[in-house]
Every structure is written in structure tokens, then in C-alpha cells.
């Protein structure tokens, strides 16, 4: 009889945070919203808060960066560790150290699905439909996958069954699609700057932005709009038609997450050939099933917010069963290892985190070390051939462990 590898049990889980409300502005890391001054990601982007004039100029003005980065580390009995980062900050640390630890410690490093199911069910009474608790569960799940990969000596994508393509091609999200084209990306997605409170004038301004970028980028480069939950159905339909002459590939997340009927109406009334996409701020498997049933062309879960890699794999299966694409919200290595195994993810997102989008910068800088970035808009699978997710934790960051058990 052949010997079967004996896997260790998990000895301890630990949680740190960095950045957030008490830190200096611009910590970056897992909370990529936390950037310094004069950064495109915080420059008059339309949001659900834009209707309040005190909060329309900056997303940080209403507190988008108050949570900070959560870092979860799991240690096996043999001393090996896995870790991951997400956006949950100090409150996520409390949930891990004071509640979720009981479902993690003492389990085999391969018991990822069991731990995941126990975490989901044990937090159901206070997690609702996602949010902070789901971000925290996602971070734990990713850390477990990282540990499992390191213990068995395989990259996470091989644990999922292996790559279905040799490389991942990317579009870039940022304020300058024209610069993204020069860097070799297949497309560029811009934020909208105006919303229903701005009336038809807002539609004209955002459509003019798309027209200008179409002229700069030429006809064959993809252009998309990210509306970040800032619109209502009527406004979104008007904006979609105003941008149709400029060959907009898709219009994204126009409505708040739970407006499923609104997404169905938007899809029904969108210009022919223009895709309707959403999912970044959906936090449960059921919400993605409902989104899929309402005709979304592309589902866009964030693996750090939707329940982790374990849930992302299930979301991809739902999308595949309906002939839909799943293109995760940019999550660096945590989505790279997933999408290279999905047959219904022909491309992926890279979030430009340099202030003016003119240079390539790792998305979760500075918290991750050895984080890969696309070269000519692509990442080859060989770049991912390291155990786990293939990155290291930068312990020189100001990591704080406020709780223990």
C-alpha cells in the first residue's frame, strides 16, 4: 500500500490589523481605498453618498477607509503558516480571536470546507447578508487555502484542479484607460463622477468623458464604466444609451446590491451589445444566485468579501450553469489563483493603485511582499508556481494584534 501524506492540524489562528480610522491617511495594504492625497481613487467619484453635498467630493469624507486591513495568520502544528489580508480591520480581529478561533484550531489543515460552513452558520445571526463579518470569514478562508498549499507544496490554483489557460489577461481599472492601453491591457474601466442628483447634466458629463477616452484609445480598446452603486434604474438606462455611440463594453454596479429587479429592468433596457455587470458588494452565495437569475452578464464577486475562495468557486459554478461570466473584483493573487482555473473567466481585473495611473504598483502594497503585477497586461501561470498564494507578509508594516485567546 502506498503511503498517504499525514497532514498536520491547525495549532493557532492570529489576527492583526493595520491602517484604519486611527492611522495616518494612506496606509494602503488590504484596504486599497486608504490612499494619500491627490489619488484618483478618492477624487470626486460618484457614490451613494454623493447626493449629500458634504460628502460628494471624496469617498474618504464619508469614511470609506475607516476599517483598515485585516491580516489573518493560521499556524499548523509543524510550524508552517498561511495568511491572507482583507478589509475588516480591528473589528475583524475581534471576530477571529473571540469567535471564529473555535472552528479553526484543532482541525486538519485540509478541513477548509468544514471550517467554512461552521463559520457561516455560527455567524448567521449577526452577519446578515454579508459586510464586515463576511469580509472576516473570507480572510480566514483565504489564509486556510494559503496554509494548505504550503503544507502540501503546491500553488493554490493546482489545489483547485489546475490551470485551464497559460496566462491571465487583464483590463485595468483607473482614471486613465489611455495609459492602460499603453501598458498592454485589453481595456480600461473608469469611475463615473456624477449621479441622479446631477440630472441630465451629469449624464452628459460622464458620456463626454467616455467620448474623449474613446477618441484617445481608438475603436478596438475596451471601455467600461464603474458606477459604484450610485444610480437609480432610470438614470442608469439613460447613461447607458448616452454612452452607446462610443462602444461601451459594459456598465457596472449601477444600483445598490439588493435591487435585483432593478438590474433585471436595466438589462432589459440596455443598448444592444452592452453588458450589465455587478457583484462586487454582494456578500452571500444566495445573493449571487439571485443576481444570476436576473440576467446579469458578468458576476464580479470580491474573493475577500464574498466568503473567500471556497464561495468564489461556487459562484463560478452558478455563473457557468447559466452561460454567464464570472470576473472577480480585483483581488490580486487571491483571485489570480482562482480565475486561471475557471473556464468562464476569459480575463480579469487589475486595479491601478498608483495615484495617477501612470505606473504599475502592486494592489495590496505594502502589506504583501513578492506580489506580482501584469507585464504587458498579462500574468503567466508560471509566476503563480509557488506554494500557497505565493506571497509573504510584510511584518515591517505597523501590525497590531488587539485581541488574543
Curated annotation (Swiss-Prot):
<dbReference type="InterPro" id="IPR023444">
    <property type="entry name" value="L-Rhamnon_dehydrat"/>
</dbReference>
<feature type="binding site">
    <location>
        <position position="59"/>
    </location>
    <ligand>
        <name>substrate</name>
    </ligand>
</feature>
<dbReference type="GO" id="GO:0050032">
    <property type="term" value="F:L-rhamnonate dehydratase activity"/>
</dbReference>
<dbReference type="InterPro" id="IPR036849">
    <property type="entry name" value="Enolase-like_C_sf"/>
</dbReference>
<feature type="binding site">
    <location>
        <position position="33"/>
    </location>
    <ligand>
        <name>substrate</name>
    </ligand>
</feature>
<comment type="subunit">
    <text>Homooctamer; tetramer of dimers.</text>
</comment>
<protein>
    <recommendedName>
        <fullName>L-rhamnonate dehydratase</fullName>
        <ecNumber>4.2.1.90</ecNumber>
    </recommendedName>
</protein>
<feature type="binding site">
    <location>
        <position position="226"/>
    </location>
    <ligand>
        <name>Mg(2+)</name>
    </ligand>
</feature>
<comment type="function">
    <text>Catalyzes the dehydration of L-rhamnonate to 2-keto-3-deoxy-L-rhamnonate (KDR).</text>
</comment>
<dbReference type="Pfam" id="PF13378">
    <property type="entry name" value="MR_MLE_C"/>
</dbReference>
<dbReference type="InterPro" id="IPR018110">
    <property type="entry name" value="Mandel_Rmase/mucon_lact_enz_CS"/>
</dbReference>
<dbReference type="GO" id="GO:0016052">
    <property type="term" value="P:carbohydrate catabolic process"/>
</dbReference>
<dbReference type="InterPro" id="IPR013341">
    <property type="entry name" value="Mandelate_racemase_N_dom"/>
</dbReference>
<comment type="similarity">
    <text>Belongs to the mandelate racemase/muconate lactonizing enzyme family. RhamD subfamily.</text>
</comment>
<feature type="binding site">
    <location>
        <position position="252"/>
    </location>
    <ligand>
        <name>Mg(2+)</name>
    </ligand>
</feature>
<keyword id="KW-0479">Metal-binding</keyword>
<dbReference type="InterPro" id="IPR029065">
    <property type="entry name" value="Enolase_C-like"/>
</dbReference>
<keyword id="KW-0460">Magnesium</keyword>
<feature type="binding site">
    <location>
        <position position="280"/>
    </location>
    <ligand>
        <name>Mg(2+)</name>
    </ligand>
</feature>
<dbReference type="InterPro" id="IPR013342">
    <property type="entry name" value="Mandelate_racemase_C"/>
</dbReference>
<feature type="site" description="Transition state stabilizer">
    <location>
        <position position="349"/>
    </location>
</feature>
<keyword id="KW-0456">Lyase</keyword>
<feature type="binding site">
    <location>
        <position position="349"/>
    </location>
    <ligand>
        <name>substrate</name>
    </ligand>
</feature>
<dbReference type="Pfam" id="PF02746">
    <property type="entry name" value="MR_MLE_N"/>
</dbReference>
<dbReference type="GO" id="GO:0009063">
    <property type="term" value="P:amino acid catabolic process"/>
</dbReference>
<feature type="site" description="Increases basicity of active site His">
    <location>
        <position position="302"/>
    </location>
</feature>
<dbReference type="InterPro" id="IPR046945">
    <property type="entry name" value="RHMD-like"/>
</dbReference>
<dbReference type="GO" id="GO:0000287">
    <property type="term" value="F:magnesium ion binding"/>
</dbReference>
<feature type="active site" description="Proton acceptor">
    <location>
        <position position="329"/>
    </location>
</feature>
<dbReference type="InterPro" id="IPR029017">
    <property type="entry name" value="Enolase-like_N"/>
</dbReference>
Amino acid at each position: 500500500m502506498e503511503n498517504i501524506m499525514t497532514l498536520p492540524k491547525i495549532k493557532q489562528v492570529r489576527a492583526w490589523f493595520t491602517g484604519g480610522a486611527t492611522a495616518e491617511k494612506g496606509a494602503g495594504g488590504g484596504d486599497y481605498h486608504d490612499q494619500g492625497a491627490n489619488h484618483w481613487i478618492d477624487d470626486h467619484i460618484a457614490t451613494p453618498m454623493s447626493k449629500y453635498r458634504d460628502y460628494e467630493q471624496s469617498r474618504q469624507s464619508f469614511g470609506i477607509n475607516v476599517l483598515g486591513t485585516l491580516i489573518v495568520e493560521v499556524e499548523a502544528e509543524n510550524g508552517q503558516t498561511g495568511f491572507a489580508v482583507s478589509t475588516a480591520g480591528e473589528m475583524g480581529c475581534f471576530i477571529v480571536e473571540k469567535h471564529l478561533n473555535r472552528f479553526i484550531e484543532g482541525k486538519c489543515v485540509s478541513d477548509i470546507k468544514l471550517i467554512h460552513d461552521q463559520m457561516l452558520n455560527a455567524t448567521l445571526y449577526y452577519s446578515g447578508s454579508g459586510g464586515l463579518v463576511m469580509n472576516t470569514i473570507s480572510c480566514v478562508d483565504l489564509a486556510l487555502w494559503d496554509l494548505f498549499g504550503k503544507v502540501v507544496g503546491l500553488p493554490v490554483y493546482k489545489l483547485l484542479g489546475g490551470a485551464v489557460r497559460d496566462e491571465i489577461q487583464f483590463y485595468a481599472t483607473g482614471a486613465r484607460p489611455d495609459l492602460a492601453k499603453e501598458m498592454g491591457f485589453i481595456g480600461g474601466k473608469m469611475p463615473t463622477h456624477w449621479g441622479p442628483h446631477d440630472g441630465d447634466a451629469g449624464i452628459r458629463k460622464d458620456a463626454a468623458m467616455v467620448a474623449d477616452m474613446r477618441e484617445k484609445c481608438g475603436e478596438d480598446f475596451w471601455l467600461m464604466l464603474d458606477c459604484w452603486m450610485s444610480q437609480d434604474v432610470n438614470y442608469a438606462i439613460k447613461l447607458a444609451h448616452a454612452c452607446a455611440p462610443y462602444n461601451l463594453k459594459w456598465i457596472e454596479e449601477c444600483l445598490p446590491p439588493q435591487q435585483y429587479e432593478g438590474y433585471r429592468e436595466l438589462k432589459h433596457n440596455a443598448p444592444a451589445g452592452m453588458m450589465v455587470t455587478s457583484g462586487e458588494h454582494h456578500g452571500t452565495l444566495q445573493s449571487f444566485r439571485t443576481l444570476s437569475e436576473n440576467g446579469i452578464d458578468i458576476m464580479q464577486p470580491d474573493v475577500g468579501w464574498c466568503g473567500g475562495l471556497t464561495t468564489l468557486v461556487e459562484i463560478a459554478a452558478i455563473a457557468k450553469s447559466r452561460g454567464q461570466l464570472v470576473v472577480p473584483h480585483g483581488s490580486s493573487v487571491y483571485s489570480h489563483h482562482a480565475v486561471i482555473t475557471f473556464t468562464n473567466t476569459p480575463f480579469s481585473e487589475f486595479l491601478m493603485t498608483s495615484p495617477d495611473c501612470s505606473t504599475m504598483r502592486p494592489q495590496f502594497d505594502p502589506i504583501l511582499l513578492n506580489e506580482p503585477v501584469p507585464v504587458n497586461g498579462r500574468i503567466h501561470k508560471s509566476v503563480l508556481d509557488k506554494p500557497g498564494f505565493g506571497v509573504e507578509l510584510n511584518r515591517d508594516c505597523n501590525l497590531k494584534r488587539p485581541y488574543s485567546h
